[in-house]
């Protein structure tokens, strides 16, 4: 995750310590240093548990290819509690209950309360359509620290994306129900050509509905997401989208609207943000680069700082890497599977510097230490090689220092991979409506 609010505008948020060290300021060292002060490489993984594959919607980008039916092999309640005890002993920083649609699982609140009793910080990833006022009260009582509700556009745009009419209205109802009981809640949106042109409308919605947190995800071509890979944004479209996100986040900050805006699943965003900030505030930009480098980007993400357990108990490097399992928690505890590097992929993910190829490799891309090669699973899905360059990198050769000499070197190594998302003619983001306040520069001090 790239916290635009923090890095671009100097804001602060509860979860900054997970991404940027103690207090969001980088690491602390010495006796008694808190868990978030560990280096990014040392931290236990934020763990996603897909508690069920069943879902009441049929989203066109669903990485688990879920549907409204019962799937066999789901971990039982007792198996789930055994898993949770192991995760607690392993001292994971957070457990994200996901799906499918996790609220379709009848024992969800029992599992969450068990996690809370063992000191685990539980969060919920949901489509929001099943959240009534009563459900919101249950969510609050169970002890979820955060609820992320998925929306992928306004009105019919979202419903087409979600595969069910009325999904937008029901998700908004769920969001408001959570707000009504004092539950911390935010929105999750995946950037595609379906919603790209309406980004300003989405930000207007965020302001109008008093959304305090919004995460903008880049498309990953897993599950049904692979069927809509052509709907991913081109390089130019991605730059436009991130520009809008930066501009509107600046405007929120300038007007004193305390909103946490993040981008997810493309660590290139951090470098792009840094380059934009460098032109405006070089001193703060260097502070931002230090935080990005401490975080390590993709280097400490999949297989290191994030992991996944699917509904049948299979362990994956992240929630998009369903095509490769390292083991099953019915046979071995997650803690043992996660620390076992006998699988070449797990070993590589935990020490990937020497493996990443092409324009992303260290010594080729000058931002490797801060980006870390971005999303390895996207490279694997596109190139059938987890160490290939990030297909969704939208920085130019000049921006990453990919000189003609380096290009010859990469070609000589046989690492001249095609970059498939760059060739389409770009669309344009619709202009900001006249009724929306103008975006201006941040004025919030020098905190990175």
Listing of model-derived features with the role each one plays in the protein:
Residues 77-98, 104-240:
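Radical SAM/AdoMet-radical enzyme domain recognition
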Residues 1-46, 57-58, 253, 261, ...:
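Flexible, acidic/Gly-rich N-terminal and inter-domain linker regions that tether
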């Amino acid at each position: 995750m790239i916290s635009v609010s923090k890095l671009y505008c100097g804001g602060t948020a509860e979860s900054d310590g997970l991404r940027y060290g103690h207090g969001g300021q980088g690491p602390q060292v010495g006796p008694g240093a808190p868990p978030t002060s560990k280096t990014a490489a040392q931290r236990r993984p934020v763990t996603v548990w897909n508690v069920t594959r069943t879902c009441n919607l049929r989203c066109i980008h669903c990485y688990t290819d879920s549907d409204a039916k019962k799937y066999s092999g789901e971990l039982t309640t007792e198996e789930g509690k055994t898993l949770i005890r192991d995760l607690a002993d392993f001292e994971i920083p957070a457990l994200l209950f996901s799906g499918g649609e996790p609220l379709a699982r009848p024992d969800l609140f029992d599992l969450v309360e068990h996690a809370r009793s063992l000191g685990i910080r539980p969060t919920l990833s949901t489509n929001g359509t099943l959240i009534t006022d009563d459900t919101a009260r249950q969510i609050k009582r169970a002890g979820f620290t955060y609820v992320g509700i998925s929306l992928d556009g306004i009105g019919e745009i979202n419903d087409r994306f979600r595969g069910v009419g009325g999904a937008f209205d029901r998700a908004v109802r769920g969001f408001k129900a959570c707000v009504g009981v004092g539950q911390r809640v935010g929105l999750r949106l995946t950037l595609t050509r379906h919603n790209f042109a309406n980004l300003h409308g989405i930000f207007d919605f965020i302001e109008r509905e008093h959304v305090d947190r919004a995460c903008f995800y880049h498309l990953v071509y897993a599950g049904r997401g692979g069927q809509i890979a052509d709907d991913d944004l081109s390089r130019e479209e991605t730059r436009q989208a991130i520009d809008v996100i930066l501009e509107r986040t600046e405007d929120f900050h300038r007007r004193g609207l305390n909103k946490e805006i993040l981008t997810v699943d493309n660590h290139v965003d951090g470098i792009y943000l840094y380059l934009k900030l460098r032109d405006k505030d070089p001193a703060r930009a260097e502070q931002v680069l230090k935080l990005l480098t401490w975080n390590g980007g993709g280097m400490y993400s999949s297989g290191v700082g994030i992991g996944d357990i699917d509904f049948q108990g299979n362990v994956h490097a992240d929630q998009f890497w369903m095509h490769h399992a390292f083991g099953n928690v019915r046979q071995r505890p997650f803690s043992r599977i996660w620390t076992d590097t006998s699988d070449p992929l797990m070993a590589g993910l935990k020490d990937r510097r020497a493996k990443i190829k092409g324009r992303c490799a260290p010594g080729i891309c000058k931002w490797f230490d801060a980006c870390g090669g971005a999303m390895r699973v996207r490279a694997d899905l596109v190139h059938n090689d987890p160490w290939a360059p990030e297909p969704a990198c939208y920085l130019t050769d000049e921006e990453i220092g990919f000189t003609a000499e380096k290009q010859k070197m990469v070609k000589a190594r046989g690492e001249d991979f095609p970059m498939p998302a760059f060739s389409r003619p770009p669309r344009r983001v619709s202009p900001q409506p006249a009724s929306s306040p103008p975006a201006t520069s941040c004025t919030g001090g020098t905190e990175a």
